[in-house]
Design a protein with these regions (language model features):
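Catalytic binding pocket for nucleotide-activated donors in carbohydrate/polymer assembly enzymes
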Residues: 85-86, 93-189, 193
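Residue-level preference for alpha-helix termini and adjacent loops
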Residues: 2, 74-78, 82, 125, ...
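Donor nucleotide-activated moiety binding/catalytic core segment of transferases
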Residues: 62-106
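Single conserved hydrophobic/aromatic residue that forms the stacking wall/gate
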Residues: 2-13, 187-197
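Structural motif
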Residues: 29-30, 67-70, 89, 114, ...
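Long, K/E/R/D-enriched contiguous segments that form extended
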Residues: 1, 11-80
Length: 197
């Protein structure tokens, strides 16, 4: 989830703000709250990527008062108590059928945040109870994920055919001003256990 968000955020930063610094842009703050288990290297790399992207955006004058990224270390209940009521959008974008979820998404919704989510975990029950008009669905269903795998999933095709995606992935692979390449994250799929919310 956080890796997907980082890719999307990279697009907002590069394509929208850097390519057109004078565009009308609604100021946005992206908050990431997570905790990496000690042995999960991929999760630690994703956290480093988020912090690297945050530092790059923070020092870019084009982003001042427009875009901010904050990573909340050691995400826990006391942070959630402050974060959840302040959130306007909750992105619950795990791969459908791949992750169990708790009730965090419900807490965001009950506090007024709009939910963008896949039909996975508790989002399924929320969608059944609240209907299409109260949740913004994203991505494939669990059945569609299985079908896509059976039909053959070739991510390189998407990379080669989508110039926006290619640009973001190339940037992540090259790294930012900290000169750290995140290419290893682009060619792996983290396990749901890698990031603990």
């Amino acid at each position: 989830r956080d890796l997907r968000m980082s890719r999307g955020l990279g697009d907002v930063y590069k394509r929208q703000l850097q390519d057109d610094p004078n565009m009308d842009f609604v100021p946005q703050t992206y908050l990431f709250g997570a905790k990496a288990a000690p042995g999960y290297h991929v999760a630690k790399e994703i956290i480093q990527l988020i912090n690297s992207l945050a530092a790059q955006i923070d020092k870019d004058p084009v982003c001042k008062d427009k875009l901010q990224v904050v990573f909340l270390e050691n995400y826990r209940v006391s942070l959630a108590e402050k974060l959840i009521p302040a959130s306007e959008i909750s992105e619950q974008i795990s791969t459908a059928g791949k992750e169990a979820s708790g009730t965090g998404n419900m807490k965001f919704m009950m506090n007024g945040a709009l939910t963008i989510g896949t039909l996975d975990g508790a989002n399924v029950e929320m969608h059944q109870q609240l209907g299409d008009e109260n949740i913004f669905l994203f991505g494939l269903t669990a059945q569609e994920v299985v079908q896509r795998k059976q039909q053959g999933y070739h991510p390189m095709d998407y990379y080669q055919q989508d110039p926006v995606l290619k640009r973001v992935i190339d940037q992540l692979s090259a790294g930012f001003d900290d000169h750290v390449s995140y290419a290893c994250l682009l060619y792996t799929s983290p396990s749901p256990r890698d990031m603990r919310r």
